[in-house]
Amino acid sequence: VFDQVRERTGFSAGLATLIASEVVNLMTCAAEIGGVAICLQLLSGLPYRLLIALAVVGLIVVCWVLPFEWIERLFGYLGLCLLVFVVAAIKLHPDWSQVAHGFVPGSSSGSSLAVYLYFVVGLLGAAMTPYEVYFYSSGAVEDRWSRKDLGLNKVTAIIGYTLGGTLSVALMIVAAVLFMPRGISPEFLGTPALSAAHVFGQVGLLLALVGILFAVGGAAIETSFAGAYNLAQFFGWRWGKKERPSGAPRFTLSWVVIFAVALVVVMTGVDPVKLTEYSVIFSVVALPLTYLPILLVANDRAYMGSKVNGRLANVLGVAYFVLILVIAVTAIPLMLITNGGQG
């Protein structure tokens, strides 16, 4: 992505985009590492700061030793333990008519319009995280995707979004059924896991924590590599997870340094949940800077050949760009006006 950002926007604007993207990547990586440490603490009872260091060392070792295919399988399959929340949501027997009513946009909590819009921006930002674009586009280049790979990966993306959306709805259902009537605000990472424990006991709690652990651990790996891909592509370094460290030393050093700096950030005692919220908002702000060069490339027949955007794709692409531009402009003002959604 970032070789195209530099080419399409110029060095200065491209560098500004790179810096903004790296800051967001670092914030996200730090938040995910904090999440890994919290899960490990809930599972082991060991000191939080010790587990932060162990989490970073463990993630670096995993990235250094395992091929990416095994990292995908390990974190992907164990992350599916999160499906315990879907089963828990069904077992709690919610009022499904109320669940269906929840799909109609609107606020029933008495919150102001600004608070409602802030959460709209946050949800859209969480679904459009730029690091996913950096990570998977770089992986596509590294794996030498051809046209025959596009169909399979479209299906994979649809399944992934459907699975993520289903998990999100399930978490909202269990929160509404278990926590809202008791006046509990699930502000801590471990709180949602209690819903699985309520339904399935210790086994449910274990599945929930393992699922969260590997989901956030996988995201930490993705953000660190996304940051390294960005730097390497912008400055023209040799890059690739499949390269030996000695063959791509600056790329390797980049993702290790991102882990190390994220470690320092989390060691300051910052709340990982709050850091996640801020990283989502700032990723929304940076998103148009990345999206525009991609839209320009999609219209370049020299790059895209027969896959160049048609008229309908351009209309949708421009409409989407206008949407994310509006979201980007309003994100920080809404965060300040609503005190981070607190009203």
Feature map (PLM): residue ranges:
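Loop-to-transmembrane helix boundary motifs in multi-pass membrane proteins
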Residues: 11-12, 49-53, 159, 163, ...
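Membrane-interface loop-to-helix entry segments
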Residues: 54-55, 63-93, 280-282, 287, ...
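Hydrophobic alpha-helical segments and their helix-loop junctions in multi-pass secondary transporters
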Residues: 80-107, 117-137, 294-302, 327-339
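Extracellular/periplasmic helix-exit of transmembrane alpha-helices
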Residues: 141, 162-191
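Flexible loop linkers connecting adjacent transmembrane helices
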Residues: 1-13, 38, 69, 182-199, ...
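Hydrophobic transmembrane alpha-helices that form the core helical bundles
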Residues: 14-45, 51-56, 216-235, 271-275, ...
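Membrane-water interface regions at transmembrane-helix termini and the short interhelical loops
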Residues: 32-43, 55-78, 266-272, 303
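Transmembrane alpha-helical segments of multi-pass small-molecule transport proteins
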Residues: 16-22, 42-65, 81-85, 247-262, ...
